[in-house]
Every structure is written in structure tokens, then in C-alpha cells.
């Protein structure tokens, strides 16, 4: 009856030998997909909606205070937004010198897809905006002008959650709304 005892000893030795072949367990590295909780589509959509409304508000005669929190955007997004403000201000001044200005707008963002890869996310969405104008000749108009613009927003995970890194049109060329500065 030494045979079953012999098999048990061989199995134990084999188990110990194979255990030595396993890689050492390490904690996940910062930025790996294991350390970043995935964003919800509604969380990203809310950030996009606020960012697009902030951007569109820059064309108004009296722009509202931006509502997107600093912790919700990367330094790269903040930098581009600051550069874009100067371009929009020049366009707005030219528009006003011709006797026109925007008085209000209404924007709806519809998320079409969300892709998450580790600490980065990409959101394809469509913006539908109606803008109301006024002119020195006719006063305020009750008929809006409008546009629909497909865009992509990118996000990066950070210690503060998911931060907006960029928003760009997915179709290039053509005439863009005054608030959208490409490049």
C-alpha cells in the first residue's frame, strides 16, 4: 500500500515546483486599466453638455460664466479653450461691426458611442444647437439659426475622475459655427 502514498508525494512535489514558475504578484501600475474605474455614459455626456454650452456661450453678446469645473478638464483642454476665446472674440467683434449679435442659444448633445481603453475614453456625439440673433436694423429675431455637428470628445482618467481632454469636429472643412475653432 505504499503506492498511493508515493503518488501523493509526487503530486505535492510537482505542485511546489510549479508554484515556483508563477510570476510574482504585483500591484497594478498607475494608469493601468485595473486601477481606473470605467466612466458611465451619463457622466461623460453631462461633462460634454456643460463644455459645449460653455463654448457656445462665448458667442453671446454677454457671455455667461463658464460652468465646467477645472477638475473636469485637463490642462491641454483649458489651454486650447483659452486660445479659442481670442479667436471667438475677434469673430464676434466682426459680426457685431456688421450690426449682428447672438442673444441666446439652446444646445442638445446626443451621445452616439463611448469607447474606453484603460485610462482613456473617446465619445462620439452629435451637437444640435439653435442660436437666436439680433440686429441693429431689426432688433431681436424670433427665428433661430441652427446647426448639427458630429464631434468626438476625448477624456483621460485622473485622481479627480474623468477629465475632458479635447472636443473636435469629426467632419473637417466647410463652415463651422463661430464658437467652434478647429485646430
Indicate residue ranges for each PLM-predicted region.
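Terminal and domain-boundary regions
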Residues: 39-40, 112-114, 158-161, 165
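Bacterial signal peptide processing site
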Residues: 22-24
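Bacterial N-terminal signal peptides that target proteins for export
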Residues: 1-9
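Low-complexity, intrinsically disordered terminal/linker segments enriched in charged
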Residues: 135-183
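Surface-exposed, charged secondary-structure patches
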Residues: 90-138
